[in-house]
């Protein structure tokens, strides 16, 4: 009976965090709008081989993540939940692997359930796992690889070992097809410390080639298909998206070596109090094979991405699966022997909630700031933000009431965030980061436009997805579409600032021409170097400028 209650509680937890509130949040640009539009175009065109964005070749990532996103929109429609359905599914599958692997390592159902709840409630997992990017997919394949390698090395027969390594190769192959060759580097680096300490080199060398073969066979069909269709894909993807992005001096998203330290700290909420103890206990018990394995899968990817020049918080998502298992194991030990870490965790959550309440007041219309984040007419959003942090502090306090029994309620600290964050985003943020909001405000003007031009790829993708059209033209800036715009068949999809006046004269009689520009908050739009317009509609950071036929 207790198991049934636990299952009902877990399903209610998943529904409140990962299902019910998702549609209340508008899509963020540039990431969510980009991936939403790529998948929409894939469904509309029926081309499941070559990814396109705004009708242009888009080679920044392979295809598998787009497949899953497309299936999400196919099943649930072109809406906010449909766009995010794929990442939510991947996150829940990863949680299922956490459950299974914890159960296999320790044979403890309670520990397995706690590891799952900790994983799903970690701030970084929830933030990325409900956000339409490709990282939850690669995290799933990496965690699946972690489980597969363990299965292979623990098997007692050659058939079991062979099956495990073949499965490992499939997960690596799908990882390559999701986000590239990092799906090969991370598993290799993560298993080497364990193989070395356990002296399991013989099994690795005897059976490892099976993983290589199954990985190649997994990638080969699509790899050959896209090489035939687009011969320069692999050259661009390998040299530009891997070498330049991560290793060279001009790598994207450059950050210092210590970049991931604050990411780990913030991402571990509401379980931050368990982080030092989980890592220390894991190191202290390094003679235990399973502990070393989990510790290696936590630390090695973190070191790898710290050394790389290009960094983003999403890159280390897979580390938190093994970390959640270590945290759950340590938490049960602490609850039984010395609950000091659990008390510290409760106080950290109280402090975080109270700090958030104070910070919300400071940036509210009633605070001391001359330019508040929320305006007076957005009072309900301020109260939503206060509710988010109040619930966080409340559940932090509740875990202290009987810490040996109530510590696990820290999983409910982000409940207010999950339910209310979509209602608390300030209008000034929505107007710049949520193209859906802009489209809703300007729908009547946008809909009849013959041509739409914009200077932001993220906004362009949002307009294309909302209006169900892929012919948005880039104006002045090419951004990440630069490579696709270089193809001969992309001629006419970019208009420079100097060419715009002539282009306008040539196309004006064909219908309404709409220009959507991103501007600074205090920028005078009358100073823009564009021909006089027939209509201007400014929505804070985005401006709609229209030219009608003459």
Swiss-Prot record:
User: Could you give a single Gene Ontology term from the biological process aspect?
Assistant: response to iron(III) ion
**Which molecular function GO terms apply here?**
4-amino-4-deoxy-L-arabinose transferase activity; mannosyltransferase activity
Which Gene Ontology cellular-component terms appear in the entry? plasma membrane
The entry's keywords: Cell inner membrane, Cell membrane, Glycosyltransferase, Lipid A biosynthesis, Lipid biosynthesis, Lipid metabolism, Lipopolysaccharide biosynthesis, Membrane, Transferase, Transmembrane, Transmembrane helix
One of the Pfam families matching this protein, by short name: PMT
Recorded hits in InterPro entries, A to Z, give: ArnT_tfrase, Glyco_trans_39/83, LipidA_mod_glycosyltrf_83
- State which residue ranges cross the membrane: 7-27, 81-101, 111-133, 137-154, 165-185, 204-224, 255-275, 288-308, 315-335, 346-366, 382-402, 406-426
Which pathway does the database say it acts in? Lipopolysaccharide metabolism; 4-amino-4-deoxy-beta-L-arabinose-lipid A biosynthesis
Quote the EC number. 2.4.2.43
Q: Which family does it belong to?
A: Belongs to the glycosyltransferase 83 family.
Q: Report the PANTHER family cross-referenced here.
A: MANNOSYLTRANSFERASE YKCB-RELATED (PTHR33908), UNDECAPRENYL PHOSPHATE-ALPHA-4-AMINO-4-DEOXY-L-ARABINOSE ARABINOSYL TRANSFERASE (PTHR33908:SF3)
Describe the task this protein carries out. Answer: Catalyzes the transfer of the L-Ara4N moiety of the glycolipid undecaprenyl phosphate-alpha-L-Ara4N to lipid A. The modified arabinose is attached to lipid A and is required for resistance to polymyxin and cationic antimicrobial peptides.
Q: What is this protein called?
A: Undecaprenyl phosphate-alpha-4-amino-4-deoxy-L-arabinose arabinosyl transferase
Origin species: Shigella boydii serotype 18 (strain CDC 3083-94 / BS512)
Q: What is the lineage of its organism?
A: Bacteria, Pseudomonadati, Pseudomonadota, Gammaproteobacteria, Enterobacterales
